[in-house]
Amino acid sequence: MPAAVRELWRMLRPGGRLVLTTWGPNFFEPANAVFWDTIQAHAPELHKGVNPWDRISDPDSLRAMLADGGIRACDISTELYEHPIASPEAWWNTLLGSGYRGTLDQLSIPARERVREANLKFVRDAHIVAVEANVLYAVAKKSTA
């Protein structure tokens, strides 16, 4: 990530702004953990212990990564947000419309159906009506000198 930031910063004109967003802490919780637990149970080879954005999901780690990429001064803000889940099926559609689809598409049809049923059951039984969708925003302005 620092190398990509370094290249973006290099390409930015003097006086320009670089704006980055990343998922904040607890992304898609409380349902995220259940999703990955069911993946581990049905396709352990696809289980990810850490999501890539977890490395930069708080202001301090995002600031450190940007500094590693050559950005010394930036403003970082956090927006706490909940993504509404109208029904268990809406949660499944959220998964299908997210980066998690890459994992789901690698499952066999029977495994995918078991993961789907486990997730729908959790959302239904736990009465989940929203998941966390917190975001961090970083804005850095390149000096004109």
Residue ranges and their predicted role:
Residues 2-3, 9-86, 102:
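Conserved catalytic/acceptor-binding region of the Class I
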Residues 51-145:
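Conserved Class I S-adenosyl-L-methionine
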